[in-house]
């Protein structure tokens, strides 16, 4: 059992590394979006809300509509959150979009991609850990007592059902915590972006400030992801063992 726990721990560390890479990629993409759009809404006196609220026109609108189509295609391929997909589709159908809306939608898209990847990777990890621990427990019981010899391996769909049932006292599952982390980052970026525009900061200063906030948000998200992966991996392993004992009627 100790070897299995060590294997689960290594898998959790590997999953965290993949999540960390996805968040880093989102940070670079967000930095690019920030630089592009803050330069566009700049005047001689700095960035302004008046410029930010101007409608996209002609080539600028065509460019963003094409970008939205790419976001939608990626969402369809990666099973994005349905509410976000609806927002993208609604925006794609609109005749008028402001520069600020375009900027925020792009930032939110990259957040959705990164946290969506975190959700998938975490779910895959927990599914594998549950199946491995459940199967190993059944094997050990059968080897020692003969009980459970006919117990088959648990399938992926059955594990998904288990993962949708909260084990923590606050009633949240791993996905709830991931989307909460994403919402916190998006809310903070919105607040800081609005502040930079309202103060009329110089473009370079605003870009520097916003990329700092993105980096802070990613650092926080990484910390939460690391803690989540390790905590959930340990809990799901224990739950698999408990459920196997229960299924076999073993005390």
Language model regions located:
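N-terminal leader/targeting and assembly helices and adjacent pre-domain segments
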Residues: 1-216
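Acidic, glycine-rich two-metal-ion catalytic cores of nucleic acid-processing enzymes
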Residues: 207, 220-251
